[in-house]
């Protein structure tokens, strides 16, 4: 064989020239597909322009189409971006939580210590997910697909072309078990469900393809195991439902991409959420029996545990949302009040930042704890309503306290408070508690368990009373009535109407649904029932049941088969009627008050007991005595609006400091408020008993007011303090400086002189999950000028000392006895609050560049030593460094 001659270093071989195409050929092969793609895009973009010109349409239609396309593309990109972000969170959960620890969008087990993380359950689900996917795929093809084809003749070609449930499995972000309920025969567990799936489901119907590529579902799923048994299988049934409507977002493909179009995407998602809510959101539930032969009626359709009556009274200091040319205007506020699937909307108060509604809404509550009261405030506009703040209240504490009358601070807004009165109404069977309707409020509820009907007439035009006999039927109607009716039921009590589901083509329909009504007058109101045919749009039977007919039956329950009027001779409907009366029950005596108004259950009855047994000492009084100081009318009016009717008995003992000196009587308007006793008269040490009355005590509850004591003006010598503070003291932002003003002190050491006192009421509100600090007022403050001082109070929850975490009261001008009555809330978990301290400083407001003294004193309170659930209200002595005097 002849050896091949070696080629020159720069020359290509003949074999390489045959196998490797030249650069011109490669360039042409790449440009050809790109050129074709470019031409197709140009034709696609210019096609609508040519079509508009051919049809003689104006350019407005082109702009409108371009706008709709851009909007659709924006929605599409946003949905894909949210899905990608959710996938990233699932893949890097630990890093995301570490980076966003201070954020609000975190799993429930981080925010709430009673929610446990169950990572072991997620590992089990992840391991078994491929097998579960195979099971679901077979169920879809073998059972779901034939059922869909049987629904209509137009769905006979319906086929699942692709079923892939992806690698992303559902997760349980947190589990909370409720063990403090009274029912010992049930286990209640709340699961924080999160499914961010990469599933791909495609369907085909008459060569039209559609499908889903990605689903997000988040919500709280409650699982109830009830009743617990002593033998196998130890559980009678499993009940599953969502406490609130879950959040659902679907990424559509194929023809269903049109559902992402502007104006349609929100409607499509809401329709799917409503479809889930009709089956799985309270009061709807799914009950799966575990033990055979068990009656599941009470489990599938339980009675409400109570009724909450919401008095939407007023709001104040709402944010200004109506702006015109940069000028701040007012708002047109209205409120949306909801519990689960029950929603109400108040009327709109136009151009008012302090609206008054005085409206009442009533809700049925099925699960406590679990369901929350949500209030959202909006500013009504012609284009889009602006958000003014929201509020979420746990109904468990309202059920415990029976009545809560409180001003609530709105969340997610700059300013605003909402005044609500919440009443928990118990369901009773005692007819003695039945009262007449007062002001349109409900006195009872009616629960209707609609079971089934039998022997409904096929021909709705052949009633015995001859109502439809005279009508002439067309040939189409005669042929149609030979089929069984598709019946549904309309039930109404008063102005409220409910409609059942439709049972297609069945003369013995089974509905198995429950409906609830509020009753205003049991003696006069009736239940109106009408069975209708969905195909013929006519009545198949009617029934009227007076509600007073239920009163003679045991447990106010009537269960029987009722004969339908205007129907066949043997047409019956089976249902159960349950009547319950509504009443606000009194709280048990001696039980601790845990509601939000507990912060303001201060001294209502004040008793003064002299401890000096001198000749001028007065004996202990049996009844309450009022202070000689005249109250402020405006503040009293405000306190009455915050009052509530239920309190607990408690007694607080405080020692009133003695006045060292008495000065000349001040002149001016504030002199009457500053002095409680005649000038020049010596005061003896006295013990102040602050008594909070029990639930049967009359009169409104007022906020704690500081005790008015005579001012003791004295001069301070020139002095500068810079005390060394350790531990938490070094974190306080108050730097005490007394060298800015020359005053005189008789007697020496500044540390031994009193700087005044401040009254605080501190308590952890479980209802709001926050620490509430009520600044009541101050007394005996140090004067900064000849006219007194302009004090205000600054509060920090150490160790947080950022400007955003700073709380500040309003400034009270020219007074040494300021009354604030301002509440601040710190949204911190209970376990975290125990590790914190309060830094409360009283300061003097001074103009910019002024040399007046700013610091008047401060107080440091270690919260780990206090009972925050019970709360405390007392006077604290102001010191330069916040520590109590030794």
UniProtKB/Swiss-Prot annotation:
Which residue range or ranges hold the SMP-LTD domain? 114-291
Q: Under what name is this protein listed? A: Extended synaptotagmin-3
> What is the topology of this protein in the membrane according to its UniProt annotation?
Peripheral membrane protein; Multi-pass membrane protein
Q: Which cysteines are joined by disulfide bonds?
A: none
Residues that coordinate or bind Ca(2+) 1: 321-322, 379, 381, 386
Location relative to the cell: Cell membrane; Endoplasmic reticulum membrane
Q: Which PANTHER family match?
A: EXTENDED SYNAPTOTAGMIN-3 (PTHR45761:SF4), EXTENDED SYNAPTOTAGMIN-LIKE PROTEIN 2, ISOFORM C (PTHR45761)
State if Metal-binding is listed as a keyword: yes
**Chain residue ranges for the region called Disordered:** 1-21, 613-673
Xref: InterPro entries:
C2_dom, C2_domain_sf, C2C_KIAA1228, Ext_Synaptotagmin_C2A, Ext_Synaptotagmin_C2B, Extended_Synaptotagmin, SMP_LBD, Synaptotagmin_SMP
Task: State the protein's purpose.
Answer: Binds glycerophospholipids in a barrel-like domain and may play a role in cellular lipid transport. Tethers the endoplasmic reticulum to the cell membrane and promotes the formation of appositions between the endoplasmic reticulum and the cell membrane.
> What's noted about domains in the record?
Anchored to the endoplasmic reticulum membrane by a transmembrane hairpin structure; both N-terminus and C-terminus are cytoplasmic. The C2 domains mediate lipid and calcium binding. The N-terminal C2 domain binds calcium ions and is important for calcium-dependent lipid binding and interaction with membranes. Two calcium ions are bound at a high-affinity site and a third calcium ion is bound with lower affinity. May bind up to four calcium ions. In contrast, the second C2 domain apparently does not bind calcium. The third C2 domain mediates interaction with membranes enriched in phosphatidylinositol 4,5-bisphosphate and is required for location at the cell membrane.
Q: Which residues form a coiled coil?
A: none
Q: The organism sits in which domain of life?
A: Eukaryota
């Amino acid at each position: 064989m002849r050896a091949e001659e070696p080629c020159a270093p720069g020359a290509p071989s003949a074999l390489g020239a045959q196998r490797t195409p030249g650069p011109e050929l490669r360039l042409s092969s790449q440009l050809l597909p790109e050129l074709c793609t470019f031409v197709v895009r140009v034709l696609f973009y210019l096609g609508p322009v040519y079509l508009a010109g051919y049809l003689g349409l104006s350019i407005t239609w082109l702009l409108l189409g371009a706008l709709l396309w851009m909007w659709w593309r924006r929605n599409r990109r946003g949905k894909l971006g949210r899905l990608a972000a959710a996938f990233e969170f699932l893949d890097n959960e630990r890093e995301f939580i570490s980076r966003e620890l201070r954020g609000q969008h975190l799993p429930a087990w981080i925010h709430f210590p009673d929610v446990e993380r169950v990572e072991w359950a997620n590992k089990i689900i992840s391991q078994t997910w491929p097998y579960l996917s195979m099971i679901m795929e077979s169920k879809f093809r073998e059972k779901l697909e034939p059922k869909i084809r049987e629904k209509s003749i137009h769905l006979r070609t319906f086929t699942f072309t692709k079923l892939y449930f992806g690698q992303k499995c559902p997760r349980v972000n947190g589990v909370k078990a409720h063990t403090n309920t009274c029912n010992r025969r049930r286990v209640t567990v709340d699961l924080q469900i999160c499914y961010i799936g990469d599933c791909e489901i495609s369907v085909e119907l008459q060569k039209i393809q559609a499908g889903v590529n990605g689903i997000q579902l988040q919500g709280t799923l409650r699982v109830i195991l009830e009743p617990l048994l002593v033998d196998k299988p130890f559980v009678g049934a499993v009940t599953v439902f969502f406490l609130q409507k879950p959040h659902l977002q679907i990424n559509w493909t194929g023809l269903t991409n049109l559902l992402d179009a502007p104006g349609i995407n929100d409607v499509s998602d809401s329709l799917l959420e409503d479809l889930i809510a009709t089956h799985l959101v309270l009061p709807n539930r799914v009950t799966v029996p575990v033990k055979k032969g068990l009656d599941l009626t009470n489990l599938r359709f339980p009675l409400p545990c109570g009724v909450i009556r919401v008095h939407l009274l007023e709001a104040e200091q709402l944010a200004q949302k109506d702006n015109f040319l940069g000028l701040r205007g007012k708002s047109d506020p209205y409120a949306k009040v909801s519990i689960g699937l029950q929603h109400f909307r108040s009327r709109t108060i136009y151009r008012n930042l302090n609206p008054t509604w005085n409206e009442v809404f009533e809700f049925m509550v099925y699960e406590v704890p679990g369901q929350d009261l949500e209030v959202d405030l909006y500013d009504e506009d012609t284009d889009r309503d602006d958000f003014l703040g929201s509020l979420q209240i746990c109904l468990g504490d309202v059920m415990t306290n029976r009545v809560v009358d409180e001003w609530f601070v709105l969340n997610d807004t700059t300013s605003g408070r909402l005044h609500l009165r919440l009443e928990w109404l118990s369901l009773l069977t005692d007819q003695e508690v039945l009262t007449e309707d007062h002001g349109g409020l409900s006195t009872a509820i009616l629960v209707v368990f609609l079971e089934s009907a039998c022997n409904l007439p096929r021909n709705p035009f052949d009633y015995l009373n001859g109502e439809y006999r005279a009508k002439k039927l067309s040939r189409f109607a005669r042929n149609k009535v030979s089929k069984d009716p598709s019946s549904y039921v309309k039930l109404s009590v008063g102005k409220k109407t409910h409609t059942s589901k439709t049972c297609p083509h069945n003369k013995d329909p089974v509905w198995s649904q429950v409906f609830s009504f509020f009753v205003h007058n049991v003696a006069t109101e009736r239940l109106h029932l009408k069975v209708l045919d969905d195909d013929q749009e006519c009545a198949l039977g009617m029934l009227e049941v007076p509600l007073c007919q239920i009163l003679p039956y045991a447990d106010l329950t009537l269960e029987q088969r009722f004969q339908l009027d205007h129907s066949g001779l043997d047409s019956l409907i089976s249902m159960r009627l349950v009547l319950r009366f509504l009443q606000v029950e009194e709280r048990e005596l001696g039980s601790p008050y845990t509601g939000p108004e507990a912060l303001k259950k201060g001294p209502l009855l004040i008793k003064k007991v002299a401890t000096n047994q001198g000749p001028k000492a007065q004996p202990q009084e049996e009844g309450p005595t009022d202070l000689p100081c005249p109250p402020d009318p405006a503040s009293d009016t405000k306190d009455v609006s915050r009052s509530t009717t239920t309190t607990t008995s408690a007694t607080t003992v405080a020692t009133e400091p003695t006045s060292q000196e008495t000065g000349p009587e001040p002149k001016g308007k504030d002199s009457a408020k500053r002095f409680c006793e005649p000038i020049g008269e010596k005061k003896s040490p006295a013990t102040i008993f602050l008594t909070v009355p029990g639930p049967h005590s009359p009169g409104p509850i007022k906020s704690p007011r500081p005790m008015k004591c005579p001012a003791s003006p004295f001069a301070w010598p020139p002095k500068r303090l810079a005390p060394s503070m350790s531990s938490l003291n070094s974190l306080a932002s108050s730097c005490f400086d007394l060298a800015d003003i020359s005053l005189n002190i008789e007697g020496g050491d500044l540390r031994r002189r009193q700087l005044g006192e401040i009254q605080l009421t501190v308590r952890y509100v479980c209802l709001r999950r926050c620490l509430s600090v009520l600044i009541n007022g101050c007394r005996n403050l140090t004067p900064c000028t000849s006219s007194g001082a302009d004090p205000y109070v600054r509060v920090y929850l150490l160790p947080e000392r950022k400007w955003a975490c700073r709380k500040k009261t309003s400034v009270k001008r020219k007074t040494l006895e300021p009354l604030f009555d301002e509440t601040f809330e710190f949204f911190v978990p209970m376990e975290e609050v125990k590790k914190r301290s309060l830094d409360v400083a009283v300061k003097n407001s001074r103009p910019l560049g002024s040399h007046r003294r700013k610091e008047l004193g401060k107080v440091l309170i270690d919260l780990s030593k206090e009972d925050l659930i019970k709360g405390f209200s007392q006077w604290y002595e102001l010191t330069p460094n916040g520590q109590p005097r030794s």
